[in-house]
Amino acid sequence: MFIYDTKSKQKVPFEPLVKNKANIYVCGPTVYDDAHLGHARSAIAFDLLRRTLELSGYEVMLVRNFTDIDDKIINKALKENKSIQELSSIYIESYTRDLNALNVKKPSLEPKASEYLDAMVHMIETLLEKNIAYRVSNGDIYLDTSKDKDYGSLSVHNSSIEFGRIGLVQEKRLEQDFVLWKSYKGDNDVGFDSPLGKGRPGWHIECSSMVFETLALANTPYQIDIHAGGSDLLFPHHENEACQTRCAFGVELAKYWMHNGFVNINNEKMSKSLGNSFFVKDALKNYDGEILRNYLLGVHYRSVLNFNEEDLLVSKKRLDKIYRLKQRVLGTLGGINPNFKKEILECMQDDLNVSKALSVLENMLSSTNEKLDQNPKNKALKGEILANLKFVEELLGIGFKDPSAYFQLGVSESEKQEIENKIEERKRAKEQKDFLKADRIREELLNRKIALMDTPQGTIWEKFF
């Protein structure tokens, strides 16, 4: 298994800290709004990593957090007259619904930052005791990055590069010093009583503490195998996580760092400030979650994905082929490539080379269909063909529906009954040699984007886009 390590900037063999086990921490969302396509892409990318590792024989522990203490949450909660707990719970539920629709496997653990305040306070106390952290006059606590000789080694940033995004405070020793603890500022603020005084943790300390509490291994030079997230988190978030872990515990946070690429909308980076965020829940109104997942996984995880609906519909044809084959093998069978599972898994073991994996999949679908055409009555390989399709489901998380359910997506139960009645009416017309009426019914359904196919087992139908 090979993965691209952001820190070393090269593809390297995956060699876990404990043989045949992999522990992964993925930065989850700050829950002040619904999930957008960038959140979905990150979740799917590292869901693919998890599935690939599991099918390669690893026991995987994957933790993905919820940041439920943050300035954005506080500001929105005040605006909507809600508590931060009430607001964050709404968006945690929304995020979970969206990821379920995208067939993302549930993490081993989903810690909330608010559940690990004691661990955060303890880590900050350790940094204060080591004289690596310092207070300013308003009570806030910062980390002195000059005490970490490796600061910037992950993201290749240094003090001459724009640190303005971190926020300038006059009493900070260096521009890149970052906040560990924000003291309580008054009625419109949120604070928790602690040995540090009333206040709340900074963003970066939250993830480091949750890594330590949920995954960290003892007596190793690294706490975990893989730390992952979107490329927008590389700096300052992941850089600062790595820094404070080295400073507090004397070890590196992760042996490997993995980052997925941005999602662009019409060739512009998707962001709330540009007003072009595309929420998952809105995309799911138009497209089934499996269709959306299939599209988002179709571009290599490290590349930028430029979202457009035309490409989404093109990618849907791949799903159509999977279900068309599944539909066929449930009735009549042919031979397949016996090395298919090995070949497609090897592609994914090469830094999640999904483009190559999808090419192997396309070849399998085409060759199997050709063999079915040549020998439609051969039933000897039914189990093997269905096992290969099951393997695709487990590896890529697509192709898990019943074919009839897939091809009839977006059709209500009342519409289905109406279509079945029309098919029965057409059947009677054909029996009575009234072919004009039969053709008229077919055309009527076609105009409603319903295609009919006559098979030896009877007429079947599907909805097309």
Curated annotation (Swiss-Prot):
Chain positions recorded as ATP binding sites: K272
Keywords attached to this entry: Aminoacyl-tRNA synthetase, ATP-binding, Cytoplasm, Ligase, Metal-binding, Nucleotide-binding, Protein biosynthesis, Zinc
Motif ('KMSKS' region): 269-273
Enzyme class: ligase
EC identifiers of the protein: 6.1.1.16
GO molecular function: ATP binding; cysteine-tRNA ligase activity; zinc ion binding
UniProt subunit comment: Monomer.
Family note: Belongs to the class-I aminoacyl-tRNA synthetase family.
The protein's name: Cysteine--tRNA ligase
Provenance organism: Helicobacter pylori (strain HPAG1)
Gene: cysS
